Structures are given as C-alpha cells and as structure tokens.
Amino acid sequence: MQNNKIIVGISGGVDSSVSALLLKQQGYDVTGVFMKNWEEDDTDEFCSAEQHIADAQAVCDSIGIPFKKINFAAEYWDNVFEHFLTEYKAGRTPNPDILCNKEIKFKAFLSYVHLLGGDYIATGHYARTKVIDDGSVQLVKGLDDSKDQTYFLYTLGQEQLKQTMFPIGDIEKSRVREIAKENNLVTFDKKDSTGICFIGERKFKDFLSKFLPAQKGEIHDENGIKIGMHDGLMYYTIGQRQGLGIGGVKNRPEIPWFAAQKDLENNVLIAVQGHDHPMLFKDTLQAIDLSWVAGSAPADSFRCSAKVRYRQKDQPCSVEVNNDGSVNVVFDEPQRAITPGQSVVFYDNDVCLGGGIII
C-alpha cells in the first residue's frame, strides 16, 4: 500500500498539516491540495483566506510534498450555499459543514483526486475507519472523544470511505500539536477555526443580512402576549439566549428568556423564561434525507444512541424507519432544543450508523 498516491486536503490548519506529515513519514506518495470554496477574501478576526493558503504552502514545502490549489467556489455556491440560504429562508437552521463534506470534500474533491491519479484522499478529521469481516467499512469515532467529528461525516457511504484515510483519528489533539511543533510546522500553535467555513469569524447576522432580506416581527411568550420585537426569524435558533433583546418585561421575574419556537405563518418568535422551561424539551423527533453509512438502516426498528448537535453526549433512543425512508426517534430522556434543519446522527457505541435532517 505504501506506493499508493494519497491526496491530502490541506486547509492551513494543524490537523491537516499533521495528517500530511504522518502519511509522508509512513512512506506514501503524498500531495497536498488546498480547496478554495469561497470567492470573497473573508478576512476574519484571526486569519484571512490568503493566510490559510500561505500556511498550507509552507507546510507542504516543509514536509517536502507537492502543493496544489483547486477552486470549488462554483460547486460550493450551487450545492452548499444556495441550500443553506433556502433552509434559513424557511426558518430552519442548517449545518453547512455537513453538506460541505458531502458535496465538496468527499464528492467534488474526490473526483479531482481521481483526475490526479490519486488512490486515496486524506483529511484532518478526528474520525477512524474500520474494515469488518464482510469487507464493508465502518465509520468510527476518533480516539479523542472531545474532538470526534463523525457527526459531520455521517453522509459518507461505502465508496467514499473505502477511498478515505483519517491519519490523526487515533491521536489526541494535544499530541497532534506536539507532533507539529516537533517537526517545525508553522501551524503548530494556530488557533482552531470555528464558525461556518464561508463566514469565518465574522458576525453571523451581518453576513446573513447581505443575502436574505430580514422581516422583523413580534416576540410572544407562551401565552401569546407580546414581549418584544425580533429582527427576523432566520437569526434565531431554538434554545438561543443571547441576542433576543428581551429585558424588563412587566410583572415578570428577572429570569433569562430563550427562543422556544418559530411561528413562521405569523412571523412570530415564541420565547420562554428559564434554561429548563418544558417548552424547550422534547423526547421525539422526525428526520428526513437519511444517510446510512452501511448503505441501509440496521433494521426497521432498532435501539441506538444519537446526537442532535455536535459535541452532545450520546443519548439512548429507539428508531423506527418509515416506509418513505424517514425515521421517528424516541429518546429515553427529553432532549433540550431539538432544532429543525440540524442533523440527528446515530451511533452503536463508537460506530457511526448514519443520520438525517430534523424536521
């Protein structure tokens, strides 16, 4: 396998840098490729797109591997960003990083890798793969549970996983930084990127308002009484506390308010008081657009655990697969702030089974 040509997605961050280094050290024929998915040079608070490219180039030069750039901005706009806007317009809260992995990193990029004559792609995700007895590949959580990224990778199928390597999946994040420092990689102390890939660290509200006209409306309490005004339903997520702008409501205790529901028909945001208000909790959800890593669901009904957001602790649940492919999920314990548009991802211990979009 050591003669195989591996194309590493190099982002200019420490995780992909160390992934490329480890593969080179293991004797593979490695090429680093930087994917540019967004045209505007979005100078964020700590690093511009040009800086990411420069860091990626420096890492490849340091390791001694070829460096290439590929522009997927058109594909990203058509297959990720327009869907992102459509979802927000509909009052849902999408996760573009999941769609980016599905449409760009493990689809458009994979096709490009084939053009380069690559045998495998590699990324700096904290995840692992495992080939089981029947020859199929499982998607397994990364060793560093606090950094596990299988939540973002649940749309990957067998064909993609058979051609993918996750070199740092078996390593703790702290060790990844040590390896980068020991090998004098410029990214060793670079801050982890947060936020949506095309927004960087900019204020989300400012960014979204450039693309979608906001429609202001009223904020009501659970009894339908007006308690404030909102700037546009798309700016709010279920369970959100910050930025509601509700304060000093007459005859109400000084307890924080949280976004609980969106009444799209009437353009009303419903807010409730208290982090643990019953309206913020549900023990059931329905999901559509299911992706199963193995190619199909484990059974028509099964027990497993699930996450309704990244970094949430796995929650025990029962899953029922409907005739149309959607699923009904019943949790053993009520879950806070289940959010339409986000993904629910299913696990059997450390094995990621797949997931879908919450409606």
Curated annotation (Swiss-Prot):
Active-site positions on this chain: 100, 197
Keyword Transcription regulation: no
EC number: 2.8.1.13
Top-rank EC class of the record's enzyme: transferase
Cross-referenced InterPro entries: MnmA-like, MnmA-like_C, MnmA-like_central, MnmA-like_central_sf, Rossmann-like_a/b/a_fold
Residues noted as binding ATP in the record, renumbered to the chain: 9-16, 35, 124
UniProt subcellular location: Cytoplasm
Disulfide topology: 100-197
Region feature (Interaction with target base in tRNA): 95-97
Entry function: Catalyzes the 2-thiolation of uridine at the wobble position (U34) of tRNA, leading to the formation of s(2)U34.
Example GO biological process: tRNA wobble position uridine thiolation
Swiss-Prot/TrEMBL catalytic activity: S-sulfanyl-L-cysteinyl-[protein] + uridine(34) in tRNA + AH2 + ATP = 2-thiouridine(34) in tRNA + L-cysteinyl-[protein] + A + AMP + diphosphate + H(+)
Region (Interaction with tRNA): 147-149, 309-310
PANTHER family linked to this entry: MITOCHONDRIAL TRNA-SPECIFIC 2-THIOURIDYLASE 1 (PTHR11933:SF5), TRNA 5-METHYLAMINOMETHYL-2-THIOURIDYLATE -METHYLTRANSFERASE (PTHR11933)
Lineage, opening ranks: Bacteria, Pseudomonadati, Pseudomonadota, Gammaproteobacteria, Thiotrichales
GO molecular function: ATP binding; tRNA binding; tRNA-uridine 2-sulfurtransferase activity
Designated name of the protein: tRNA-specific 2-thiouridylase MnmA
A GO cellular component entry from the record: cytoplasm
Site feature location: Interaction with tRNA: 125, 342
Family the UniProt entry places it in: Belongs to the MnmA/TRMU family.
Keywords assigned by UniProt, alphabetized: ATP-binding, Cytoplasm, Disulfide bond, Nucleotide-binding, RNA-binding, Transferase, tRNA processing, tRNA-binding
